[in-house]
Amino acid sequence: MTTTWWELQILCDPSLEETIFWRLDDFGCRGMAGEQKGQSYLIRAYSPQAEFDHLDLAALALLLKQDAVLAHLPKPVVKWHLIDEEDWSSSWKSHWQPEEIGDRLLIYPAWLEVPTHSERLLLRLDPGSAFGTGAHQTTQLCLEALEMRLGQQPETQVIADIGCGSGILSIGSLLLGAKQTFGVDTDILAVTASNSNRALNNIEPERMVVAQGSIDTLPKMYPEPFDGIVCNILAEIIIELIPKMSAIAKPDTWGILSGILIEQIQPIADTLEQNGWAIAALWKKDEWCCFNIRRN
């Protein structure tokens, strides 16, 4: 029996991109992709028709528009229509191509044939419904920051990945030479995606450990303090996590935080200072930024 899917198309202000991806993930979409369209951003997302009806999609569209109003941004244009299984499986993937990030990494979709030669570290990925394809500015900023942090003696570094999504930051860390990563995500689909992508990149399970949970879960997975902490989620959640980060940190632990809009810099900076963290560098890409931090 052929499954029928809803394809949602959301044309939005680029500043809404991460919020919309979060909403779609929370809604239960199984595949998401985005691309620049002039001054706007077009997001496509897919959900089984059997699980959602028109009223569900209308309610989702209303939430997306309310998010825009609260952010003082134009309301997104939301449309949806039905497609069959074959169209779904190929549609969102066709909009995602290999992506060079920094000086060393190449993010490569799992369904493409592996290149016979590449001077870059090949990070193969099939995100499924989890956030993190490498296309988003915040993911790129985090990977570039990891490349800098792991440039010297990476083999000693044990890293916590909070909100691991597809596992892209954990895998990137390990390809760049880190000793071990421990990732957590509240979404079980993200845990599944991370483990699948770990296997796709031939990484041993003991080097990349993933579990459902949040920052409080990490000490149960690894009782020692971490050398590094990476976190690429919404700024509001990062503000809640910062007071808990010292409990899993050493005096010289570093951190990489993103998912933060430029207008959200000040509340993040204030919360870091109040909790004993110093900003070593602040990187920006378009309307997004990435905090490189260390213990103060």
Curated annotation (Swiss-Prot):
Name recorded for this polypeptide: Ribosomal protein L11 methyltransferase
EC number: 2.1.1.-
Record-level GO BP terms: methylation
Presence of keyword Transmembrane helix: no
Alphabetical UniProt keywords: Cytoplasm, Methyltransferase, S-adenosyl-L-methionine, Transferase
Residues involved in S-adenosyl-L-methionine binding: 139, 163, 185, 232
Catalytic activity annotation: L-lysyl-[protein] + 3 S-adenosyl-L-methionine = N(6),N(6),N(6)-trimethyl-L-lysyl-[protein] + 3 S-adenosyl-L-homocysteine + 3 H(+)
NCBIfam families associated with the record: prmA (TIGR00406)
InterPro entries according to UniProt: Ribosomal_L11_MeTrfase_PrmA, Ribosomal_PrmA_MeTrfase, SAM-dependent_MTases_sf
Free-text function comment from the UniProt entry: Methylates ribosomal protein L11.
Entry similarity comment: Belongs to the methyltransferase superfamily. PrmA family.
Subcellular locations according to the entry: Cytoplasm
Any one Gene Ontology molecular-function term assigned to this protein's record: protein-lysine N-methyltransferase activity
Keyword match tRNA-binding: no
GO CC terms of this entry: cytoplasm
EC supergroup of this enzyme: transferase
One Pfam assignment: PrmA
Highest rank taxon of the organism: Bacteria
